[in-house]
Amino acid sequence: MGSSSLSEDYRLCLERELRRGRAGVCGDPSLRAVLWHILVEDFDLHGALQDDALALLTDGLWGRADLAPALRGLARAFELLELAAVHLYLLPWRKEFTTIKTFSGGYVHVLKGALSEDLLIQSFQKMGYVRRDAHRLMVAALPPARQLVQVALGCFALRLECEILGEVLAQLGTSVLPAEELLQARRASVDVASCVAWLQQRLAREEEPPPLPRRGSPTGCQARLDLYRDVQEDEGSDEASLYGGPSPGPDSPTSELACQPRFWEQSARLWGAGGGPWEPAEVSSPTSGASEEEEPQPEAFSFLSLRRELLSRPGDLAPPHAPRSPEQASPPPIPEPPGYQMHTCLAPGALPALCCDTCRQLHAAHCAALPSCHPGHSLRTLRGNSQRRLWLQRAQVDALLYDSPAAGP
């Protein structure tokens, strides 16, 4: 099935839904299944759809320590872009759809949290939007209907691509890996199984990942986002928002529960009448009590810092002092944080690839415990054999300091 045939089927799906009173993204399960099957076998279909898949996926995933929440954020962003194109195609006379606020609503909470500003502007330019000022995008001239359908179909395909990549990570058993390796494996494979096998071989070699730039975490769950209105308008109005549903009430499930459905579930369920908008799962944040007890980021290990640590333990290295009177008694020492430990996934002498500052454990890149460890934890990649050896030595020294009995005077 060629791109022109897919575009026609997609157009018929949108118009069929409009006759049913719903102007939203495509929710046809048969079209979704067909497009999924073609995309899995041929990544190059994205080129025929002209959806800039490689540039958008690379931009959205690059620098992310955990690719699973990044994919959820990207899927949400592509869904919002698809909806913007669908609105212009089905309802071109609606003036509210011709202006997009770039300082509030879904643009800030969903789009800018997943993609760079330059690529967002390029995506909206395909729909006929131009930057009017620093705060608004406006439709200068409405593109042909065929072009709007093509843009919306491309965003639909990008949503399915996020689903395919999510399935790869689910079968792989970990989502902590470099984005470029995931995309390279996806482009070189013809199905999910071969992509997973390729990545398993790469992880088994434990090759050193390339350095990744720092990047903030994806935007978490937000209630009732709108591309076209201000925050004040969103909060003060109970009218149907861009997504066709009222804002969640006090009896609605929490954002955490609302995020439980898997992000690749069908659009009909995500966008059905009366249902709240689906949002990506938010990286869990510590409560106020936990944040007060949060430990500072540990410094990079060196033997100088080890010496300072040893010298700070007078009970082990210094002779005992004469007992003091109660008036002269010093305050009790502040308990030290526990040392770093080697997780059981690491064989004796094996170099760690990841460090969890919350659990204070070192892991291998393919550790099976990572999916249950990393949500909400401070997980970082150890780059370079020299850094990995230093952390291995630190864990060995910590084992001596904290596990063995204190030395006598």
UniProtKB/Swiss-Prot annotation:
Pfam families attached to this UniProt entry: SPATA2_PUB-like
Region of interest (Disordered), residue spans: 233-257, 270-299, 313-337
Leader peptide range in chain numbering: none
Any one cellular-component term (Gene Ontology): cytoplasm
Classification via InterPro entries: SPATA2_PUB-like
Lineage top rank: taxon: Eukaryota
TM segment ranges: none
Family designation: Belongs to the SPATA2 family.
PANTHER family (UniProt xref): SPERMATOGENESIS-ASSOCIATED PROTEIN 2-LIKE PROTEIN, SPERMATOGENESIS-ASSOCIATED PROTEIN 2/TAMOZHENNIC
Name of the protein this chain belongs to: Spermatogenesis-associated protein 2-like protein
Gene designation per UniProt: SPATA2L
